[in-house]
Amino acid sequence: MKFSVLMSLYIKENPQFLRECFESLVAQTRQADEIVLVFDGVVTPDLEFVVTEFETKLPLKLVKLPQNRGLGKALNEGLLHCDYDWVFRMDTDDICVPDRFEKQVAFIEQHPESIIFGGQIAEFGKNVNDIVAYRNVPTSAQEIIKFTQKRCPFNHMTVAYQKSAVINCGGYEDLQEDYYLWIKLVAQGLYMANLPDILVYARVGNGMVSRRRGVNQAKAEWRLFKLKYRLGIQGLLSGLFTFALRFGSRLLPTSLLKKLYQTFLRK
């Protein structure tokens, strides 16, 4: 089978992080058939240099947006340029384990009814030997449905999905773009899973926690609650309770939100 990798690059990315990401793609035991890299607006000359360096090493397909449109819209645009129905997501500052694609291709071949699946991540600081936490997500469809009521059930940078299914349900939203999408897919009763294996080393710091707080993120929680209730993912009282907890967390100072993540949401 053939598959596309979908990535989005923006001006504030660190060139060294991008280089390490690309190196992990070069080192894959099963190479991607194409890598669609969306430039979400103008990027720095240093980032352009790294991309040019790897154009001879990776099957890069560049999609350049004239203005920054945000991750959700950039990914929606990138999907339209993916030649293959199976799309593997990757972030430009993370690092794939060497056999990530090999494992995911094997899963698809063993489970052709699959629509979406991902895996586990190890979060790191300075380098992949500096593991600070793990974000574990459930592996079975039944556990994923239950998990979706309260938290995002997939690690976005590990996910592989069928492009047609994502486009048919409306694609990505602007805020909390992945969680909205997973809710819509889960509600359709499609075959889904997560591998128990760590597939990606995810970089922490780099503004990760601060991007998850703020008034707009808090407002997005109300839309999440309404979507989960409307699609039958979560009941009214349980949904309101979850909304209150998630809404409040979005308004915490960054230092407190970081402690919340470390204490309750990571292992």
From Swiss-Prot:
Keyword annotations: Glycosyltransferase, Transferase
- What's the EC number here? 2.4.-.-
Task: Cite the GO molecular-function annotations of the record.
Answer: glycosyltransferase activity
| Annotated CDD domains | GT2_AmsE_like
Which Gene3D superfamilies does the record associate with it?
Spore Coat Polysaccharide Biosynthesis Protein SpsA, Chain A
- Whether Glycosyltransferase counts among this entry's keywords is yes
Q: Top EC class per UniProt?
A: transferase
Is Transferase among the key words of this record?
A: yes
Q: Which residues cross the membrane?
A: none
Entries under InterPro entries matching the protein = Glyco_trans_2-like, Glycosyltransf_2, Nucleotide-diphossugar_trans
Pfam families xrefs: Glycos_transf_2 (PF00535)
PANTHER family attached to this UniProt entry: GLYCOSYLTRANSFERASE, GLYCOSYLTRANSFERASE EPSE-RELATED
- Annotated family: Belongs to the glycosyltransferase 2 family.
- Record-given protein name: Uncharacterized glycosyltransferase HI_1695
Which species?
A: Haemophilus influenzae (strain ATCC 51907 / DSM 11121 / KW20 / Rd)
